[in-house]
């Protein structure tokens, strides 16, 4: 029965993953404002669901999937996006209700009921946002700019998304509690970077594309940390190079700030690896 529950929870995990990215794409495209902030807050609640589900899967002896479910990112207006977000929530609600009926494990059932309550609230929020977007005349602020600046920002977004998933997966699988905590902390920091870069790209006239590259799926903590150190070293050097190629002072400061964070991550992971190898 555990295998069936794990499969259902991984299906739920895919849905949460899709919702997070869909909502962030919409929020970033709207720029700064009250409704964009509210949508980001909903995305953060979906991140909490993602974490709960992943931990439950590991507790049952499974491996959390990093596959992303189907997203609804089309639509020619902000209100159309909000309708798609309602549909995303309705799909999630139906799936959670189905799994709650199918699962007998009391603790898992209780967890899904807790998440379901949030999803119903989110659906109501997005229904409200349909009207709010129409009344406020909310617009898609993304542009079609494509040059060296947008190329650098697109690369940064791709990297940050990749390591968010990699560090979270490693945090779920490692038995090392200190490493787990640090990996989750750095994943949160990388999520901040993703937001900064996406917002900068929209402000610069571009359009964020949130996709990831290959993710290390090591099962031994030392191997995880070696992979994490390797990618951080490569990326810190690339942020440094990119900052040197940028004339815009504000963007240069942003890239150097992120570079400094990546250097910090290298030091943290290196200390953890040294302890793990003792």
Could you tell me what each predicted segment is?
Residues 1-278:
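Iron-associated oxidoreductase/ferritin-like identity signal
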């Amino acid at each position: 029965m555990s295998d069936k529950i794990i499969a259902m929870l991984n299906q739920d995990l895919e849905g949460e993953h899709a919702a997070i990215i869909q909502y962030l794409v919409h929020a970033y495209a709207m720029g700064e404002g009250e409704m964009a902030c509210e949508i980001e807050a909903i995305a953060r609640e979906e991140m909490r669901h993602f974490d709960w589900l992943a931990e439950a899967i590991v507790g049952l002896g499974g491996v959390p999937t990093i596959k992303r479910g189907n997203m609804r990112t089309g639509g020619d207006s902000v209100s159309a996006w909000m309708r798609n977000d309602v549909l995303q929530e309705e799909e999630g609600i139906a799936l959670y209700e189905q799994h709650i009926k199918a699962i007998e494990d009391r603790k898992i059932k209780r967890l899904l009921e807790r998440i379901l309550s949030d999803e119903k609230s989110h659906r109501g929020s997005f229904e409200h946002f349909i009207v709010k977007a129409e009344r406020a005349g909310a617009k898609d602020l993304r542009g079609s700019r494509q040059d060296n600046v947008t190329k650098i920002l697109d690369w940064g977004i791709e990297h940050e998304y990749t390591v968010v998933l990699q560090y979270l997966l490693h945090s779920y699988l490692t038995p090392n509690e200190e490493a787990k905590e640090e990996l989750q902390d750095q994943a949160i920091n990388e999520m901040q970077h993703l937001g900064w870069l996406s917002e900068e790209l929209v402000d610069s006239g571009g359009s964020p594309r949130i996709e990831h590259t290959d993710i290390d799926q090591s099962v031994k903590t030392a191997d995880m940390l070696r992979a994490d150190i390797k990618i951080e070293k490569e990326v810190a050097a690339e942020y440094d190079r990119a900052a040197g190629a940028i004339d815009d002072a504000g963007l240069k400061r942003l890239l150097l700030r992120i570079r400094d964070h990546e250097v910090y991550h290298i030091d943290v992971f290196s200390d953890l690896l040294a302890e793990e190898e003792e």
